[in-house]
C-alpha cells in the first residue's frame, strides 16, 4: 500500500503527523503536500493516505475535486502482516500516481492503490499505482497539477 517513501536523503512515514509527499508541479518543481489524514486529525478529508483506483473510478472522490498528480520518489516501503519492512526502488522515469483532493481550499495528497501483482501480493494485497512518465497522457496525469 506504501507506508513510507524516500526521495534523496528524506524518508517520510505515513504515521508521522506532519507527513508530506513530494508532488511534481506543472513547471517541474517539487512541492511537498500533506499526505492524507491521520485518525486523530479533525478535518473533512477521508481518513488514511490511500485512494483505491476502483473508488476513484466509482466517483467516491468526486466531491473533493480530485486531480491526478505524480508523486516523485526514489523508493517506497511496504510492510507485510508481521510488520517486516520491504523497500522497493522505482526505475528512472517512474512515479507513484497520487490523487490531490481539495476541501475548502486546502489540498491533501493520497497514494492511488490497486490490487497487487501476484509476486507482491504476499507482502500486501494493495499496491501503489506505478506509472512511467513517457507512457502517460500529459493532459490527463502527465506533468501533474499545482497543489496550490
Residue ranges and their predicted role:
Residues 1-148:
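Short linear sequence motif anchored by a di-proline
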Amino acid at each position: 500500500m506504501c507506508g513510507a517513501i524516500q526521495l534523496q536523503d528524506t524518508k517520510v512515514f505515513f504515521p508521522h503527523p506532519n507527513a508530506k509527499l513530494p508532488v511534481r508541479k506543472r513547471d517541474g518543481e517539487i512541492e511537498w503536500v500533506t499526505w492524507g489524514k491521520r485518525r486523530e486529525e479533525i478535518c473533512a478529508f477521508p481518513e488514511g493516505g490511500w485512494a483505491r483506483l476502483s473508488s476513484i473510478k466509482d466517483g467516491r472522490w468526486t466531491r473533493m475535486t480530485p486531480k491526478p498528480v505524480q508523486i516523485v520518489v526514489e523508493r517506497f516501503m511496504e510492510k507485510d502482516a508481521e510488520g517486516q519492512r520491504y523497500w522497493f526502488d522505482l526505475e528512472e522515469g517512474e512515479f507513484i500516481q497520487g490523487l490531490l483532493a481539495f476541501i475548502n481550499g486546502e489540498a491533501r495528497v493520497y497514494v492511488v492503490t490497486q490490487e497487487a501483482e501476484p509476486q507482491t501480493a504476499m507482502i500486501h494485497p494493495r499496491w501503489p499505482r506505478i506509472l512511467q512518465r513517457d507512457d502517460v497522457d500529459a493532459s490527463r496525469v502527465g506533468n501533474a497539477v499545482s497543489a496550490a
